[in-house]
Swiss-Prot record:
CDD domains: GrpE. This is Protein GrpE. It is found in: Cytoplasm. It comes from Campylobacter lari (strain RM2100 / D67 / ATCC BAA-1060). Its main location: cytoplasm. Participates actively in the response to hyperosmotic and heat shock by preventing the aggregation of stress-denatured proteins, in association with DnaK and GrpE. It is the nucleotide exchange factor for DnaK and may function as a thermosensor. Unfolded proteins bind initially to DnaJ; upon interaction with the DnaJ-bound protein, DnaK hydrolyzes its bound ATP, resulting in the formation of a stable complex. GrpE releases ADP from DnaK; ATP binding to DnaK triggers the release of the substrate protein, thus completing the reaction cycle.
Length: 169
């Protein structure tokens, strides 16, 4: 009987050990699944941060370029004003020609970097134009541009300066 008792006890211990091992295995599997999930989420978050940083880098570069181009528009305005001054003698004509060449070169370089003049003819568009004042005009339909007061510019399809215009009532 003692041998049967021992066999029964061994079987009980084996079953108990087997249950303990199964419980331990389930715990380890759950812990593994949790760690795997945490890893996958952290990896996805890292990839999202990487993509966001790349977009912010591109955006910062574009903004810096837009800011620089916007600053150059004052130079364009000054050169255009100088070209529009009447030249009376040969020296003034030569200076005016040099200023015109400088203006043309600057405009080519701006265009190379996607800076374009906003069309300021036809119907007023509040997305592109800034109405400085409204005027009566027999020659223009209502809500159409009468006069360009200051050129507007776009860069990469974004307005860097609205065209300042007068608009027919």
């Amino acid at each position: 009987m003692s041998e049967e008792k021992q066999n029964g006890q061994i079987q009980e211990e084996t079953v108990e050990n087997s249950e303990n091992q199964n419980n331990e295995l389930e715990k380890l599997q759950a812990e593994y699944n949790e760690l795997k999930d945490t890893y996958l989420r952290a990896n996805a978050e890292f990839e999202n941060i990487k993509k966001r940083m790349e977009k912010e880098k591109i955006s910062a570069t574009i903004y810096a370029n837009e800011s620089f181009a916007k600053d150059l528009l004052d130079v364009v305005d000054a050169l255009e004003a100088a070209v529009n001054v009447e030249a009376n003698d040969e020296i003034s004509l030569k200076i005016k020609e040099g200023v015109q060449n400088t203006l043309d070169l600057l405009l080519k370089k701006l265009e190379k970097h996607m800076v374009k003049v906003i069309d300021a003819e036809g119907e007023f568009d509040p997305n592109l134009h800034e109405a400085m004042f409204h005027v009566e005009s027999a020659d223009h339909e209502s809500n159409h541009i009468v006069q360009l007061l200051q050129k507007g510019y776009m860069m990469n399809d974004r307005i860097i300066r609205s065209a300042k215009v007068s608009v027919a009532k």
